[in-house]
Curated annotation (Swiss-Prot):
Origin: domain of life: Bacteria
The species this protein was found in: Haemophilus influenzae (strain 86-028NP)
GO cellular component, one term: cytosol
Binding site for ATP: 229
UniProt keywords, alphabetically: Aminoacyl-tRNA synthetase, ATP-binding, Cytoplasm, Ligase, Nucleotide-binding, Protein biosynthesis, RNA-binding
Gene assigned in the entry: tyrS
Protein name: Tyrosine--tRNA ligase
Length: 395
């Protein structure tokens, strides 16, 4: 039992809920490899740090000798998961789903052991359900129970439409657990309802219900909302080391500890020691550097992490410009705000104006207050914020 307690404590780290812990203990007592499932709909080509919170937990199960299944929702991705949405998510085409799925496989192996990871596609069984199977599946749940779900309840209360296929989605995800005979399913806190549907469907099928483990959603770079590509507050696992380093260094000191708890593999005692040192006067920047290097070493290598640190020091602490930066050439007159947008330094001309008003736009190191004028002729280095540079020639 002591060993089980040790394993349980390790598995509980960073989790939000385990439903139920007693069931997990019973499964661990069986002393067999558990089937642990994590599903993801390939709705976008990139995996970001927010996704890795649950991937890290899957890796932990893998290291403990359990069977891990990374389920790619090539079928459910065409339906669209309504979790956490205040409007109907537009379904993707099969071509989009399959293209994104290919990049997923490459990226998850930055975290999971490819030799011990079973990748499955839920179209293998969901596409065979047919009309009769779908009706039988739908008979397991009532509309009233579906409306207990927070996002559906809010939309219903606000007279916002809920499409029938959105009610079907949790049932399809739950059926994945029946098809795989999963012992454990992982997901973010926004997936709790779907994970519990899996438990119910397994019971209806005469199987032992899976343990549902939810993990917190990682707050993005803005320090307010969950990390999301659509919000632009994310760090992709395939981003260049220098970009990853700069973005990690940009987060607030308060958010840093949340990231340490959810992303770092350091022992909790070591994280607590770092926090104590900061409280006693250690510069939080130095602790943030440790986190940035740990993440870059994980997704690239230690050499890249050290190089990114040195570049960061040269660029920001010594005021140096990077040796390499994107280069652009424009012919004829072009507005400065338009140039910044076309060079990828800002998402819009309005953002260029806002950045300039805040003192964040520079040409050759000199601040520019008005970006409504035309850009100067010749070759110049344009900078927005601390990390974005471009060498631009206006002919």
């Amino acid at each position: 039992m002591t060993n089980i307690n040790t394993v349980l404590a390790e598995l509980k780290r960073g989790t939000d809920e385990i439903l139920s812990e007693a069931d997990l203990i019973e499964k661990l007592k069986e002393n067999r490899p558990l089937k642990v499932k994590l599903g993801a709909d390939p709705t976008a080509p990139d995996i970001h740090l927010g996704h890795t919170v649950v991937l890290n937990k899957l890796r932990q199960f893998q290291q403990l000798g359990h069977e891990v299944y990374f389920l790619i929702g090539d079928f459910t991705g065409m339906v669209g998961d309504p979790s956490g949405k205040n409007a109907t998510r537009p379904p993707l085409s099969r071509e989009d789903v399959l293209r994104n799925a290919e990049t997923y496989k490459e990226q998850i192996y930055k975290i999971l052991d490819p030799q011990k990871t079973k990748i499955v596609f839920n179209s293998e069984w969901l596409s065979k359900l047919g009309t009769e199977g779908m009706i039988r599946l739908a008979s397991n749940y009532t509309v009233a129970r579906m409306l207990e779900r927070d996002d559906f309840k809010k939309r219903f209360g606000n007279n916002q439409p809920i499409a029938i296929h959105e009610f079907i989605y949790p049932l399809l995800q739950g059926y994945d657990s029946v098809a795989l005979d999963a012992d454990v399913e992982l997901g973010g806190t926004d997936q709790k309802f779907n994970l519990l549907v899996g438990r119910e469907l397994q019971k209806s099928a005469g199987k032992k219900p899976q343990v549902a483990i939810t993990l917190p959603l990682l707050v993005g770079l803005d320090g307010e909302k969950k990390m999301s590509k659509s919000l632009g507050n994310y760090i992709g696992v395939t981003e260049a080391p220098s970009d990853m380093f700069g973005k990690v260094m940009s987060i607030s000191d308060e958010l840093m500890w949340d990231w340490y708890n959810l992303l770092s593999f350091r022992p909790l005692s070591e994280i607590a020691q770092l926090k104590s040192e900061v409280e006693k006067g250690k510069n939080p920047r130095d602790v943030k550097i440790l986190l940035a290097k740990e993440l870059i070493a994980r997704f690239h290598n230690e050499e890249a992490a050290n190089a990114a640190e040195q570049e960061f020091i040269n660029r920001f602490q010594k005021g140096a410009m990077p040796d390499e930066m994107p280069e652009f050439t424009f012919s004829g007159e072009i507005g400065l705000a338009t140039l910044l947008k076309e060079a990828g330094l800002v998402p819009s001309t309005s953002e260029a104006i806002r950045s300039a008003q805040q003192g964040g736009v520079k040409i050759n190191g000199e601040k520019v207050d008005n970006v409504k004028d035309n850009a100067p002729k010749g070759t110049n280095v344009y900078q927005v914020g601390k990390r974005k540079f471009a060498r631009v020639t206006v002919e």
